[in-house]
């Protein structure tokens, strides 16, 4: 879903950047790493995801951690390939990398996971739950749509509007 949102937002702003494909792949890797880590015993301790045994259940907890770490690192290695595909777009690629790192990091998805883990076994108020969803789910959707807009040459005002819309999309996707 996230790469498609990135591509469609890019198209909406008239983009045709060759830098888009590495970012789409990177986004899917970041999302997958987050699921691998979320399933670990220290986090949600899930045995199954999408009807199949989780990574750590098949390969062990140590390999689950390393697989997630490898996916995150390879995601950024892949995104950096955009510089060689579209060197003339270095400024927008740099801005896209900044957004990707921020939304996947402590002010985004990881921050949401920190709150989630800290609330394990506790009753959680709706506002806190909304914050967790906004950060864990919404942040990567925001990044996807913002990166699509950035690489298409959208203005900062348009990017801020996309971020607001994407936040609503993220919250709606958790409500299903």
What are the residue ranges of the model-derived segments?
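Mg2+-dependent prenyl diphosphate-binding active-site environment of isoprenoid biosynthetic enzymes
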Residues: 1-176
């Amino acid at each position: 879903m996230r790469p498609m949102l990135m591509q469609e937002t890019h198209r909406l702003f008239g983009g045709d950047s060759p830098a888009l494909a590495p970012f789409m792949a990177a986004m899917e890797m970041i999302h997958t790493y987050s699921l691998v880590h979320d399933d670990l015993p220290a986090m949600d301790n899930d045995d199954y995801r999408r009807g199949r045994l989780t990574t750590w259940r098949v390969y062990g907890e140590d390999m689950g951690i390393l697989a997630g770490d490898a996916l995150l690192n390879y995601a950024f290695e892949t995104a950096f390939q955009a510089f060689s595909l579209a060197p003339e777009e270095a400024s927008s690629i740099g801005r896209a990398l900044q957004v990707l790192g921020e939304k996947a990091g402590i002010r985004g998805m990881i921050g949401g996971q920190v709150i989630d883990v800290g609330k394990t076994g506790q009753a959680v108020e709706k506002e806190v739950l909304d914050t967790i969803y906004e950060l864990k789910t919404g942040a990567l959707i925001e990044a996807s749509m913002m990166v699509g807009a950035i690489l298409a040459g959208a203005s900062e005002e348009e990017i801020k509007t996309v971020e607001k819309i994407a936040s609503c999309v993220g919250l709606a996707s958790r409500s299903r």
